UniProtKB/Swiss-Prot annotation:
Keywords, sorted A to Z: Ribonucleoprotein, Ribosomal protein
GO CC annotation terms, alphabetical: ribonucleoprotein complex; ribosome
UniProt record, GO biological process: translation
Name of this chain's protein: Small ribosomal subunit protein bS21
Amino acid sequence: MPGIRVKENEPFEVAIRRFKRTIEKTGVLTELRSREFYEKPTAERKRKLAAAVKRNHKRLRSQMLPPKLY
């Protein structure tokens, strides 16, 4: 669990912002959301495969040449 030390004379809002940044970097919230409900191993594999296919299509679209307009 990430934590921060509040510095002397540091505003509360700044400390909260630093804490949120460390939480975001470590990925605690995304893991918490994924573990909120049980997901069957087959459903997890299916979701990961669909995400990989989507990433692949996105990568291929960016590599394609633009159509000629003349």
